[in-house]
Amino acid sequence: KRPLLKTDKFDGFIIGFQPCRPSSRGNIRLLSKEINDEPLIDPGYLSNEKDLYDLECAYDFVRKISQTHSLDNIIDHPIGIDLIKSSTKEMISHFRQNATSVYHPCGTCKISPDKNTGVVSDRLKVHGLQNLWIVDASVFPNITSGNINAPVMMTAYIGGNLISEDIKKLT
C-alpha cells in the first residue's frame, strides 16, 4: 500500500522537489453519521494554477540539472517513466496520477473569527458548539514551510492554556 516505504534492491538516486506552500486545497467529507465509517478525503493535489506553474518551473530546473555534464555521466537510465524526456503535459499527467503528500496534512479546521471562513475561533473553539475545542495541525490557517511538529506543540501549549481559561469561566 505504501510503495515509497519499501527499500529498493538496486543502486540509484532521486532528484525530487515539492511545494513548501501549495495553494491547492482539498476537502474531507463525511459519507454517513456512523463514527466508524471512513470519510471521503480528496487532497486536491495540483488543482490550482499556481501549483501547476510551480511544478513546471521545478520540472524545468530538474531537467536542466539532469542534463549537466556531472550528472549525465552517472545517469544510466531512468527508473520507470523517463520524465526528463517527457513533455510537460505527460509530466503533469504523471504527477496527477502519482503525487502524494509527505505525511504532514494539516489545515482542515482553519482558525478564523468568521464561521463562514473557518471552523474554529481564535480560542480554538468550534463555531456554533459549546465546550468543543480542536487543538492540532488541522487548525492551521496556512501550511508551514517545514515539519509541523514544533507548530503543533506550540498550538497544544497555547490551546491547553485557552481551554483552562475557558473552563475556569464555566465554573
Regions found by a protein language model. Name each.
Residues 1-151, 159-171:
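FAD-dependent oxidoreductase catalytic-site/capping-region signature
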Residues 156:
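ATP-dependent carboxylate activation and anion-phosphoryl transfer catalytic cores
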